């Protein structure tokens, strides 16, 4: 089963086409990762999946229906998005920010309910941020803040969670912390995770499904072990490398080369 499908999807701004005639299927209940060079359209594609950018042509299909034929409230109850570098209102506490995830369920007839409170508390527990609930968000570390933002998307209680570079500007320890959390949410709670990552090796380790975006379309898609090879890295990133098995996780491991090749280093030694 698929969570999100694109059919002949073309995206752009004004006269510039960013994505052209893209057909992909992102599996339900899995972790999917979009990879590609800077400016290739990964973030643009994620915006279209979240109904934040209308296609120039084609469609994004959610639950068997064109996402742009569904109401904003209906889409917000099916998927949540965490953009790059979100800003929290000054002075807002962790619990107040996480509570904003319940906004799609509020209207003038339905105010804050016991269910809303329960979902917020559950999201805090799932992300290990319940002990931080009364602290200001701007007083937290980078890893803590990212977990709080993820908690807000969980409070929204959607089947699909979209994340645009959730590890950006985090140190390595916090990158692993965030990615472990996302995988746990997928495996233990059945969330469909779709995210953009720049680190190829972490993408291979955490992804069930991978889409390589290049030349305005999907250059390859499938399990990392099936699609990631030296030819793909050369084409998509214009980078020479060797792909070897990760000795611990048994996923593809990319060893990139710069101007100095391995044999040159060996000769110098």
Curated annotation (Swiss-Prot):
GO cellular component: plasma membrane
Protein origin, superkingdom: Bacteria
ABC transporter domain location: 4-240
Binding-site list for ATP: 36-43
Location of the protein in the cell: Cell inner membrane
Membrane topology (UniProt): Peripheral membrane protein
GO MF term set: ATP binding; ATP hydrolysis activity
Function: Part of the binding-protein-dependent transport system CbrABCD for uptake of the siderophore achromobactin. Probably responsible for energy coupling to the transport system.
Similarity annotation: Belongs to the ABC transporter superfamily.
Annotated GO biological process: achromobactin transport
Keywords per UniProt: ATP-binding, Cell inner membrane, Cell membrane, Ion transport, Iron, Iron transport, Membrane, Nucleotide-binding, Transport
Species whose genome carries this gene: Dickeya dadantii (strain 3937) (Erwinia chrysanthemi (strain 3937))
InterPro entries for the chain: AAA+_ATPase (IPR003593), ABC_transporter-like_ATP-bd (IPR003439), ABC_transporter-like_CS (IPR017871), P-loop_NTPase (IPR027417), Siderophore_ABC-ATPase (IPR051535)
Annotated protein name in UniProt: Achromobactin transport ATP-binding protein CbrD
């Amino acid at each position: 089963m698929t969570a999100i499908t694109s059919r002949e999807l073309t995206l752009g701004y004004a006269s510039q086409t960013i994505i052209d005639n893209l057909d992909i299927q992102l599996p339900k209940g899995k972790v999917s990762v979009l990879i590609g060079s800077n400016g290739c359209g990964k973030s643009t594609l994620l915006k279209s999946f979240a109904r934040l950018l209308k296609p120039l042509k084609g469609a994004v299909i959610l639950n068997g229906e064109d996402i742009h034929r569904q109401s904003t409230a209906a889409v917000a109850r099916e998927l949540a998005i965490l953009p790059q570098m979100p800003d929290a209102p000054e002075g807002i506490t962790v619990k107040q920010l996480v509570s904003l995830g319940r906004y799609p369920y509020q209207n003038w007839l339905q105010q804050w309910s016991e269910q809303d409170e329960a979902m917020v508390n559950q999201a805090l527990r799932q992300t290990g941020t319940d002990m931080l609930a009364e602290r200001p968000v701007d007083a937290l570390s980078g890893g803590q803040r990212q977990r709080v933002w993820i908690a807000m998307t969980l409070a929204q209680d959607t089947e699909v969670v979209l994340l645009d570079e959730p590890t950006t500007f985090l140190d390595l320890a916090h990158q692993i912390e965030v990615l472990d959390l996302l995988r746990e949410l997928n495996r233990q709670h059945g969330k469909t995770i779709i995210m953009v990552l720049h680190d190829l090796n972490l993408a291979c380790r955490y992804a069930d499904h991978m889409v390589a975006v290049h030349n305005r379309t999907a250059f390859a898609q499938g399990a990392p072990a099936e699609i990631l090879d030296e030819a793909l890295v050369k084409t998509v990133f214009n980078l020479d490398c060797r792909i070897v098995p990760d000795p611990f996780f048994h996923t593809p491991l990319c060893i990139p080369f710069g101007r100095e090749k391995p044999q040159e280093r060996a000769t110098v030694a």
